């Protein structure tokens, strides 16, 4: 496993500083070791996860200029941990309501010595919770409150929930083609830029939606 991770990370991230490459490798080794017992990532295929999830996270990183970030429903730490590794001067808060994910994220933070990472066991929809970062991230976020909503209404609900936290100026969503099918009314209600991720590894499309609050 470690050899496959090392070879693929070296291929995909050949232009990154060696220290960041090493941290990504160490993170992924921990991720797949934990995944083998706790199922915390979308695929057991190391090459797929690196070329899809980690690569896309690295592209997302280039869009974020603010100094503090909250990754909502961080799960196994994608994209939040990757953003923290690539941006050591930015404060990255990872929140999730499941103890399995929180325990793993705490281990990663400790073993990789990521001083810019804050891990919180937190329900995003808790009315008493307020985000203290300048931007918020969502990727494959799920919760029973929004499970039966279509994509547009789910997106509206997430944005309106974030807006209750006055410090947040932008919301980023790493998503697929449904973001291209939002109604005219949605675009009248929200200012949003959508950027396609140009991946050399996959023909299927992924997008970064940037919503200005």
Please report, for each region that a protein language model flagged, where it lies by residue.
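Conserved class I S-adenosyl-L-methionine
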Residues: 66-75
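Conserved SAM-binding loop of SAM-dependent methyltransferases across substrates and taxa
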Residues: 76-88
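Class I SAM-dependent transferase core
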Residues: 5-66, 104-115
């Amino acid at each position: 496993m470690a050899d496959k991770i090392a070879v693929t990370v070296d291929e995909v991230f050949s232009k990154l500083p060696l220290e960041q490459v090493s941290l990504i490798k160490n993170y992924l080794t921990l991720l797949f070791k934990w995944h083998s017992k706790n199922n915390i990532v979308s695929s057991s295929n190391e090459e797929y996860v690196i070329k899809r999830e980690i690569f896309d996270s690295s592209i997302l990183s280039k869009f974020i200029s603010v100094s503090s970030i909250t990754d909502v429903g961080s799960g196994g730490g994608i994209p939040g941990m990757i953003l923290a590794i690539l941006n050591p001067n930015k404060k990255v808060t990872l929140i999730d309501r499941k103890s399995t994910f929180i325990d793993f994220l705490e281990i990663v933070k400790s073993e990789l010595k990521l001083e810019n990472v804050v891990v919180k066991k937190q329900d995003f929809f808790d009315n008493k919770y307020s985000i203290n970062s300048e931007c918020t991230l969502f990727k494959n976020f799920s919760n029973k409150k929004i499970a039966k909503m279509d994509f547009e209404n789910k997106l509206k609900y997430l944005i309106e929930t974030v807006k209750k936290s006055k410090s947040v100026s932008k919301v980023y969503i790493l998503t697929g083609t449904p973001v291209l099918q939002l109604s005219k009314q949605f675009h009248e209600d929200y200012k949003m830029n959508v950027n396609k991720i140009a991946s050399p590894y996959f023909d299927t499309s992924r997008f970064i939606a940037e919503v200005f609050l």
